[in-house]
């Protein structure tokens, strides 16, 4: 019988998994992470969506998916950057996580 080598995870995967673990059960940290992601990457919405996905996984993705009212295929497309979410979808996603979309003036 041939031995199969265990595949090493990439550092990015290890980091993301440890971040998910760190964010579990800490809503203040989840909020700070999302806020920083959006503020520091305002010109790259895909980074914010990846942060939202990370928080959703920290809270339990299956339960999160049910709360959004969106089907899993739609969520997969949004989080894999296959499709830009409609505003309505983004509002549902944030609402399922206990957040809301707000607008503030840019700092000069």
Regions found by a protein language model. Give the residues of each.
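Alpha-solenoid HEAT/Armadillo repeat architecture
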Residues: 24, 38, 57, 80-83
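DNA major-groove recognition helix of helix-turn-helix/homeodomain DNA-binding modules
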Residues: 87-104
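N-terminal flexible/basic segments that precede or flank functional cores
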Residues: 1-50
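Recognition helices and adjacent regulatory flanks at domain boundaries
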Residues: 48, 61, 103-105
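Short alpha-helical DNA-recognition segment
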Residues: 57-77
């Amino acid at each position: 019988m041939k031995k199969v080598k265990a595949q090493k995870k990439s550092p990015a995967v290890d980091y993301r998994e440890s971040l998910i673990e760190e964010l579990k059960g800490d809503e203040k940290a989840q909020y700070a992470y999302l806020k920083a992601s959006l503020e520091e990457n305002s010109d790259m919405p895909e980074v914010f969506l990846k942060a939202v996905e990370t928080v959703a996984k920290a809270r339990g993705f299956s339960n999160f998916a049910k709360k959004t009212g969106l089907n899993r295929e739609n969520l997969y497309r949004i989080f894999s950057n296959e499709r830009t979410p409609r505003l309505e979808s983004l509002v549902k996603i944030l609402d399922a996580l206990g957040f809301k979309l707000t607008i503030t003036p840019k700092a000069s």
